[in-house]
Design a protein with these regions (language model features):
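Active-site neighborhood of HAD-like aspartate-dependent phosphohydrolases
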Residues: 1-40
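Metal-dependent phosphoesterase signature
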Residues: 54-96, 101-103
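An amphipathic alpha-helix signature
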Residues: 20, 24, 36, 47-52, ...
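Short beta->alpha linker loops
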Residues: 18, 46, 86-90, 111, ...
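Asp-based, Mg2+/Mn2+-dependent phosphohydrolase catalytic module
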Residues: 1-2, 96-99, 112-113, 117-217
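Helix-loop "lid/cap" segments that line or gate small-molecule binding pockets
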Residues: 26-27, 46-61, 119, 151-152
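Short helix-capping segments at alpha-helix termini
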Residues: 29-33, 57-64, 124-128, 156-157
Length: 217
């Protein structure tokens, strides 16, 4: 592998569980209970097209979406849940390994670039990424491959030499469509049969990705 492309939420940072709690809290403020399958539909996607059926069944959904977006950019909000930081196990060690071995890496997130930069500021140890690609930088989000292809292009690496690290179904599908290798690290989403068919590698955490990279060299 000549580079690593990282998803952000749920992969680098333990934000998905907090986001679900946040959605539930905001929903209740509107007198609405958020269904569990809505979280599966929204995880790893750029826009709200995947939520189209829910706009008919979940009252005030647009208001809930708007309120959640505002909170996502609030560092104090994240710090209230994780005073010691949001980073997932192995993030710092893997990032240092990539840096020491001169392997380029890029964050490729469905979220806006500004939001990714907000989360990076929560880490006590500075992380090195050669670039950040946000969902606001491409026309089509995951499961389309645009985000990963742009990341590879910025790093100057051919798709077949890229390893994508993902925790979502849409991200795994996007990696497959980009012609890249993928490693799934489970967070809140349990793989279904379709997802299993597209997962090339699977590890418990980012720390184990170091061993995978050693094997692939």
């Amino acid at each position: 592998m000549k580079d690593c492309l990282f998803d952000c939420d749920g992969l680098m940072f333990d934000t998905e569980r907090v986001a679900q709690d946040m959605w539930r809290e905001i929903g209740r403020s509107f007198g609405v209970e958020i269904p569990d399958d809505l979280f599966v539909a929204i995880t790893g996607v750029k826009d709200t097209r995947a939520l189209t059926p829910y706009f008919e069944t979940v009252p005030h959904l647009q208001d809930i979406l708007d309120a959640s977006r505002k909170k996502r950019f609030d560092l104090d909000f994240w710090a209230s849940f994780y005073p010691d930081g949001l980073n997932k196990k192995g993030l710092v060690a893997l990032n240092q390994y990539l840096d020491e071995n001169h392997i380029p890496c890029c964050v490729c997130s469905s979220s806006k670039k500004e939001y990714v930069e907000t989360l990076l500021r929560t880490v006590s140890v500075p992380l090195h990424f050669d670039s950040i690609v946000g969902g606001d930088m491409v026309e089509h989000g995951k499961p389309d491959p645009d985000i990963f292809l742009l990341g590879a292009s910025i790093l100057g690496v051919d798709p077949e030499n890229c390893l994508v690290l993902e925790d979502s179904k849409m991200g795994i599908l996007a990696a497959k469509r980009a012609g890249m290798h993928s490693c799934f690290i489970q967070d809140t989403i349990k793989p279904d049969d379709e997802m299993r068919e597209n997962i090339e590698f699977e590890k418990e955490d980012l720390l184990q990705v170091i061993d995978l990279l050693e094997e692939l060299q």
